[in-house]
A protein has these predicted regions:
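Short, small/acidic-rich helices and loops at N termini and domain boundaries
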Residues: 333-349
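Active-site phosphate/pyrophosphate-binding segments
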Residues: 15-25, 34-41, 46-49, 167-265, ...
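C-terminal active-site/capping subdomain that shapes the small-molecule cofactor and substrate pocket
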Residues: 257-338
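Generic N-terminal amphipathic, Lys/Arg-enriched alpha-helix
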Residues: 3-29
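A generic structural motif
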Residues: 80-83, 241-252, 296-306
Length: 349
């Protein structure tokens, strides 16, 4: 018997840990008060030459969003780092921001300690754990975020905290107004995508049904890489479904050649409502090429949103809903991550 996405009682039995409630809460994070660091960030201000945002998993996803959003506003180079070793440029002129919701991420802790040895200015972000203790030992600022169901469900809290860190370090202007505007658009998306909205009016339920039984291949413009990567990760963690992503225009110079056969692949192109003429040309050429070569019919995900932050958060929220509905269609509780936990246990031996 297939799952009825309009049967709230049936869906609640599948979503035993209530991941849907965590997704519903996402807009509220950007409407509420912002957590300020326990130690003044005046202590880390200096003439920075670079910024490194360190994280893994859901914590790194927050860093991805922050850089896609604020990279153009930052006066110095910045990158997201995802391994324990550090690049050679990290030194005393680097602002090193470690994001770890659990505070126990081994790669993040190792990189944080190495950054300390190199004299970098340090900031920690998370919900306690060893990172908070290390920040206390190092007398480094620490921003504590609110509790959440899982690290990936703390995306909003981590984005806000990272933006606050950059503000307090005098690298960007206040982002509170832009967050409030983005929250208003997120509330509208929640209204359309929440579990009570019927399938015929719910774009997230419709997309989940289209994805069921397929291997999603995701594409987005380079400036929206955080959205594509987040959706790929949410399909893995929530839907327990393999997917991949690539970015344009780069994908038009290599990956497009692989679309001679469709197999069970379903291309999904993530777009926004404010593309330039050049961007529209890139997306149109790519879509037409893979469609004609593979006879596939790419899905397009486009959310009307204004503002640099809204253009990222709006599709992220929509696609987070999709990943939970797809898990329900597959009769899978979205929350447990047994293989991730097994991997971490093996790494700790």
């Amino acid at each position: 018997m297939p799952v009825d996405l309009d049967d709230v009682k049936q869906l609640s039995k599948i979503d035993q840990s209530n991941m849907m409630a965590a997704v519903d809460r996402f807009p509220d994070i950007f409407l509420g008060p912002r957590n300020e660091p326990q130690v003044s960030l005046k202590e880390v201000r200096s003439s920075f030459k670079s910024v490194v945002l360190m994280g893994m998993g859901g914590s790194a996803s927050a860093a991805d969003v922050v850089l896609d959003w604020l990279r153009a506003a930052l006066p110095i180079p910045a990158l997201v780092h995802r391994e324990p070793g550090l690049p050679s440029f990290v030194n005393s002129r680097t602002l090193f921001i470690a994001l770890s919701y659990s505070g126990e991420t081994s790669e993040t802790l190792a990189a944080f300690r190495e950054a300390k040895k190199r004299g970098s200015s340090l900031v920690g972000i998370g919900h306690g754990g060893s990172l908070a203790s290390i920040c206390s030992d190092f007398k480094a600022p620490y921003i504590q975020v609110e509790a959440s169901l899982a690290p990936r469900a703390a995306l909003g809290q981590l984005i806000v905290a990272a933006a606050v860190a950059l503000e307090k370090a005098d690298l960007i202007r206040s982002t509170s107004r832009e967050m409030s505007k983005a929250a208003q658009e997120l509330v509208r998306i929640r209204r359309r995508c929440r579990i009570e909205t019927p399938l015929e009016d719910n774009p997230a339920k419709g997309l989940a049904l289209r994805l069921l039984g397929h291997f999603p291949v995701l594409y987005a413009l380079q400036r929206m890489s955080s959205v594509a990567r987040r959706f790929k990760n949410q399909l893995a963690e929530n839907s327990k479904l393999l997917a991949k992503y690539d970015l344009l225009p780069e994908g038009g110079h290599n990956e497009v050649e692989a679309w001679h056969e469709r197999d069970n692949l379903l291309p999904v192109i993530i777009r926004d409502a404010q593309e330039t003429a050049v961007e529209r040309s890139i997306l149109r050429a790519f879509r037409t090429t893979i469609s004609s070569a593979s006879r596939s019919h790419p899905l397009e995900v486009r959310v009307a949103a204004r503002g640099n932050l809204s253009k990222l958060l709006s599709p992220i929220l929509l696609l987070d809903y999709v990943s939970v509905y797809l898990a329900m269609l597959r009769r899978i509780d979205p929350t447990p991550n047994t293989l991730i936990n097994e991997y971490k246990k093996r790494m700790s031996r």
